UniProtKB/Swiss-Prot annotation:
One of its GO terms (cellular component) is large ribosomal subunit. PROSITE patterns: RIBOSOMAL_L1. This is Large ribosomal subunit protein uL1. Keywords: Repressor, Ribonucleoprotein, Ribosomal protein, RNA-binding, rRNA-binding, Translation regulation, tRNA-binding. GO terms for biological process: regulation of translation; translation. Signal peptide: none annotated. Binds directly to 23S rRNA. The L1 stalk is quite mobile in the ribosome, and is involved in E site tRNA release. Protein L1 is also a translational repressor protein, it controls the translation of the L11 operon by binding to its mRNA. Part of the 50S ribosomal subunit. GO terms for molecular function: rRNA binding; structural constituent of ribosome; tRNA binding. Belongs to the universal ribosomal protein uL1 family. It comes from the Bacteria. Gene3D superfamilies: 3.30.190.20, 3.40.50.790. InterPro entries: Ribosom_uL1_bac-type, Ribosomal_uL1, Ribosomal_uL1-like, Ribosomal_uL1/biogenesis, Ribosomal_uL1_3-a/b-sand, Ribosomal_uL1_CS.
Length: 235
């Protein structure tokens, strides 16, 4: 078992073994995010699903109102005049079969891959290299589309794809320590609503198991999911 650093041990002792109201949890996370860089704020959510069954898989996108605070590198595989459109829209990598070959040889210098439908037969051959990294374009995730300019703009602005892993856990980076508590809360609330809205049809029993937030170098804090779901903004 990995030994905790003195810093982590000291920070962890301040956190009680209970669930916290969302804003209280975020305040603690921000207070503990005192590294010498702008730490990323993450959510780790265990759901009551078994993704080995197709009707219990969760994979979708969410547009966080305040973005993620991170810049992402986007690659686009398309053809014809769409290559120029991808370039002008801000894609970091773009191309046709040449980009397919480059990726097949191991060039994975991007965070997101978008493809137009006409190129998917060629992209499908990259399953061996894209699949394990979760980079295979998917219509449900908005990464297989004919409107590549809009897709690039949305993902650059903070739209992100997320999925439940094999254990039914969702890992999402939803902001930076420099964000205000309210901005982090609004991002977190949007994420929660998206997970509820996209609940797999085969999910049985208790859907939300545990919900933790943490920073890059800090301890995790458990969030009261019911309080997050029940929150209503003041009119």
């Amino acid at each position: 078992m990995k030994k905790l650093s003195k810093r982590m041990t000291a920070l962890s002792t301040k956190i009680e073994d209970r669930t916290y109201a969302p804003l209280e949890a975020l305040a603690i996370i921000k207070e503990n995010a005192n590294a010498k860089f702008d730490e990323t704020i993450e959510a780790h959510i265990r759901l009551g699903i078994d993704p080995k069954y197709t009707d219990q898989q969760l994979r979708t996108t969410v547009a966080l109102p305040h973005g993620t605070g991170q810049s992402i590198k986007i690659a686009v595989i398309t053809s014809g005049e769409n290559v120029a459109k991808a370039k002008s829209a801000g894609a970091d990598l773009f191309g046709e079969e040449d980009l397919v070959e480059s990726i097949n040889k191991g060039n994975m210098d991007f965070d997101l891959l978008i493809a137009t439908p006409d190129m998917m037969p060629k992209v499908a051959k990259l399953g061996r290299v894209l699949g394990p990294r979760g980079l295979m374009p998917n219509p449900k995730a908005g990464t297989v589309t004919s409107d590549i300019a809009s897709a690039i703009k949305e993902f650059k602005a903070g739209k992100l794809e997320f999925r439940a892993d094999k254990a039914g856990i969702v890992h999402v980076r939803f902001g930076k320590a420099s964000f205000t508590e309210n901005a982090l809360f609004e991002n977190l609330k949007t994420l929660q609503e998206s997970i509820d809205k996209n609940k797999p049809s085969g999910a049985k029993g208790k859907y939300w198991k545990t919900f933790y937030v943490t920073s890059t170098m800090g301890p995790s804090v458990q969030v009261d999911i019911n309080a997050l779901q029940d929150y209503q903004p003041e009119s």
